[in-house]
């Protein structure tokens, strides 16, 4: 299969189940909301080494938020319900409560269950906290130096999908990077998904474990390193490829991840110099979801 002359390899992305939350962060201005959303989703690229996977889903205009202010929906994900509960409390408490003019609301419509994050955080008010109702939502109002911080009492979580992915192979590092950025921009329009790596782009693909060091849980994927293509016997890098980037996607469900992969691949294939699109998997032995690239189109 080809798209705009770019080979789409007949392979699949192997994705995994993960617990997902969606949190709406509002503030007095779009800029302030973006700052808080960015802070709360930091250090959230992969649960290989981070305490959560997190990213910004989408912007929400004032006319669509409970308090009539601009906001951003973020997603925070973790395989463990207990760990996700902890991460929500920590990231909202340290990344959003501390940010100027912010408020926080649940943004997950079809939750499997709810966690009482706002109820727990209200105790920061040290007895001065109050209970309100906004747009039919139970809200805790916590007095802070600049006014009151508002947070919804409960936040929904559900079973989502993590690790949807594809590799972009270009004739140069520059072409592959431009295509990766185009892919991330396209995926940003797919609601219910995030690309949790820096700028949405993975530069250092990894494999499980190590060939040499027993103490490592993960190490560089030498088969996908362009500078090793003449050194590694079973390299997966074509001779004319000199730049590779990976896009990893987390979503509220498989359908959202599939749509994001499709739109991202289509966008990547519009960039000159892109030679091939592939995907990462573990032979189908680890992940519950096997997303075939050809089936996306």
Curated annotation (Swiss-Prot):
It catalyses: N-formylmethanofuran + 5,6,7,8-tetrahydromethanopterin + H(+) = N(5)-formyl-5,6,7,8-tetrahydromethanopterin + methanofuran. This is Formylmethanofuran--tetrahydromethanopterin formyltransferase. The gene is ftr. HAMAP family: FTR. It is an enzyme of class 2 (transferase). Homotetramer. Catalyzes the reversible transfer of a formyl group from formylmethanofuran (formyl-MFR) to tetrahydromethanopterin (H(4)MPT) to produce 5-formyl tetrahydromethanopterin (5-formyl-H(4)MPT) and methanofuran (MFR). It is found in: Cytoplasm.
